Amino acid sequence: MIKQLVKKKITKHIEDTSKRKLSIQFSLDGFSFCTSNASDEVAEFSSYVFEKSVNSPELILKKLQEIFKTEKSLQNDFESVTVIHQNNLSTLVPNQYFKEDSIASYLKYSVKTIATDLIVFDDLEFMDTKNVYIPYVNINNFLFQNFGEFEFKHHSSILLEKLITKSDDSLKFYINISQSTFDIVVTKDSKLLFYNIFDYQTKEDFIYYILFTL
């Protein structure tokens, strides 16, 4: 079962429909998207939450296929499409230690990988770091069939850029909460001091990881 948690249409008429932009984010918990115009004004935002977190990219794809069949807003043409993969299959590697031909080795200590996994990276220029991660290839393929070429990123790349580029001299502790995971980001002096993503099921899990980080 898929519950549509939020569907918000904002009265921003897009005169030139060829200039529509689409942003999509998905995880094991749900799916959301927003459309905007050439000035990046949001025209529509929708969020769907899965009744239970799914445990594989194959099950996410089935959920997305259901949504795409009924969501008319996703059946339009778009000038650009951005896809955000939200998962815990990532790690940060400073540029001075990064070698693209060794990319698989950076995940082996924190993520269970197999030989056929596609491993990619986002270039985080604002902190001289690469964000190495595993995207869900089957979902990328499905979206390519629907929209053609698009840009994709890991959710933590966007989160870190937003928080670090606006940080100041003070110590900041941020929590970004999803249905079954949450990110903790600690910054100071426009630098990253700590980042991790945690799974949780109970409020005790949530409190434990926060206290552990503090």
State the predicted function of each range.
Residues 2, 123-213:
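Small-residue (GG/TT-enriched) beta-loop-alpha framework at ligand/catalytic clefts
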Residues 1-28, 44-59, 71-75, 84-90:
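Intrinsically disordered, low-complexity acidic/Q/S/K-rich activation/interaction tracts characteristic
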Residues 3-8, 21, 52-57, 103-105, ...:
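N-terminal start-of-chain detector that recognizes signal peptides
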Residues 28-56, 191-204:
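Short glycine-rich, Thr/Ser-proximal phosphate-binding strand/loop in the N-terminal lobe
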Residues 53-65, 203-214:
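Helical "lid/coupling" subdomains associated with nucleotide-phosphate turnover
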Residues 2-43, 165-191:
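Gly/Thr-rich phosphate-binding beta-strand-loop-beta motif of the actin/hexokinase/Hsp70
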